[in-house]
């Protein structure tokens, strides 16, 4: 899926294949992207995958925390609103894997700043939203 939707300025939601293993800049530069559901099969996500996206939330379904390409930046770094202020977004992970994400070297920073949440919290935070798998 390398570069599949890269730079798509109108994409707000996308359904990714359930067999996807590697997200390699598939959504980089998709600035209108508001939400994403990352399938259970994903093992790697590109650095800055969601840079400049208008992300409200991401649902990350893999039980094992995915690794990041190019470890300097994380996929969810540099998410800004239209005034270039850091956007407040949440990353929801499976409840039974939350502790593993929270202690993971790559994901723990999101937990420290309150961006990482259990998937069961999604319905409370977004009562009018439904996510697709």
Question: What is each residue range found by the language model?
Answer:
Residues 7-21, 31-44, 53-67, 84-97, ...:
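Structural signature of tandem-repeat unit edges
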Residues 28, 51, 73, 99-116, ...:
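Surface-exposed repetitive/solenoidal architectures
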Residues 24, 46, 101:
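Short acidic, gly/pro-rich beta-turn/loop elements at beta-sheet edges
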